[in-house]
């Protein structure tokens, strides 16, 4: 039977590449809050007690490699971009953990796993790029074991930016919503032990945290690839220039939050 290919958000051919296309091409991943936020999410999801961990939207694979090295568990890493997965596999080989990570191309709204599979699921900077947040969360719950944890790290609007800035937001997350909207979505899930830790962004600290998480070994070559695209690829050149020209004041309207929930245990059969 033919396997249904996940819907891709990545463009091809002569169409101007998107923010995510550029990230995949040069091999870079951005998560709000950097190392500190991601490490806090791992703690909240009790990865030290997990045997099977899923990371959705693994990007270049920093998270899966770190989890595989730090925790005694098996990691499954999925991304909708095969280019991102290629970077992630390369990092796993460099870190010596490729045997402990399974990589799959998949869409967060159509995960190719059976019900009740994972002890913990980590999702960072994924739902900001999709409209179907409720459907994605239902799918995450489906593949989580009863008693397992789901942790999200997603950006939100502290307040919606003015129209002259809002147009730039499509480059950094076309599905960004307000904190109040996020609280409504998370509040009606069937998850237990729901918490939301909201944080404001500080631009300089954000840069430092991202460098600490990704590492100079990945960042410097990535900037070299950005320069190459600027010099050789007209379609990429326009997209990169647009992203580099995003007004810095847009950050003043943004925050990020760590969302935690636990799937209820199944009731004992009577």
Which ranges hold each PLM region?
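Short alpha-helix
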Residues: 175-190
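N-terminal, positively charged/glycine-rich alpha-helical extensions of SAM-dependent methyltransferases
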Residues: 1-22
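Class I SAM-dependent methyltransferase SAM/SAH-binding core
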Residues: 54, 60-110
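Conserved alpha-helix/loop element of class I SAM-dependent methyltransferases that forms part
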Residues: 31-49
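Short, glycine-/aromatic-enriched active-site segment of Class I SAM-dependent methyltransferases
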Residues: 155-174
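A short glycine-rich, Lys/Arg-flanked "PGG" loop and its adjoining helix->strand segment in the class I
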Residues: 134-149
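Conserved Class I S-adenosyl-L-methionine
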Residues: 197-270
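A short acidic, Gly/Pro-enriched loop at the edge of an enzyme's catalytic core
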Residues: 109-120
